[in-house]
Amino acid sequence: MAAAPPYVPLAWEEVPCPFCGSDDPSLYERFGSALQYTYVLCRRCRLVYSSPRPRYDAHFVEAAYASYYQLADTVALGPDTLVRESSVPMFREEVAHLVQFDARRSAVLDVGSGMGTFLFAAKPLYEEAVGLDVSPRMAAVVEAQLGVRVHLDRFEDFVHPRKFSLIHMSHVLEHVPDPNRWLRKAASLLDDGGILAVNVPNKFSAGARVQHLAYRLRLKRQFQRGWSDPARTPDHLFEPTLPSMRFLLARNGYEILDHHSYSRRDPASRRTPLARLVHRGLKVGSNLAFVARPRRAG
C-alpha cells in the first residue's frame, strides 16, 4: 500500500482556549513530524490545546479522519464484524458502572458509536439504544447487526423525539472545535435526571507528565509517539486535563457525580486497592471518565 501524502494545511488559525475563551496561553510543547504543530497551556483553566492549528475546514476534517473512513469502507458484514472480544468486557463494566447513576434507564445515545461496542453492551439494559456517527458504512453495519438506529448527523444538529436518560461520549470531545456547544446540546437532549458520561485522554497523567519532563529537558524530541508520519494531522484539537474538565462541566451547568482516571482493563477503577489509589485517589491514569448531570434550575 502506498504511503499517504504528507498533510499540508491550506491555512492556519490562532484560536483562544476552547474551554474558557482565554487568550493568554503559555507554550507547552511542539510536535509533529517536523515539530510543525504547537500545544499551548491555558493559564486560566489548564487546558492544553493546539494553536496555531490547521484551519478547521473540510480539507482538515477529510485528512484527519481518512483512516477511519478507510476502515469503515472495508468493513464487511459477518458474524465477527461487530465487536472485538477484547473490548466487550470493558464496555460491559462501564455500562454496569453507569447504570448506578441512571435509575430511569429509558433511552441511551452513544455519540461517535463507531463499531457499536458500547451500544452492544448497553442495549439489553435500556428501552431504546441510539447511535450517532459520521460513517454511513459503519452505521449500516451496526444497524444490521444490533437492530439499533444510527443517525448520520452532526451532534449540534441532531434531534430525536425522545429524551435520553444517558448520553455517552467516549474519546470524541477532544476532536470537537466547540466543546461548550456540545455540552449545552447534550443537556437539551437529556431527560430530567439524565446523565452525561464523557471519557477523554488525560494530558496530565503520570506517564504524560514524565514524558513531558523529558521533552522539556531535551531528553526526548517530542512527547507524541508515532509522529514521524508526515501524513498525520493534529486531530486532537485539545488535550483535556483534570482541572480543565472540571471547569468545562461546571461552566456548562453540570454537577459531577463521579470522576476518575481509568485503564481499559478496569474502566470503573475499583478492582484493586492500587487501582483505587491511582485512578480514584490520585487520578493520574492515561484516561479520564466523568459522570455528570445538568443542575436543576432553582
Which residue stretches match the model-derived regions?
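Short catalytic micro-motifs in class I SAM-dependent methyltransferases
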Residues: 170-175, 199
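Conserved class I S-adenosyl-L-methionine
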Residues: 198-220
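Short active-site alpha-helical segment characteristic of glycosyltransferases
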Residues: 245
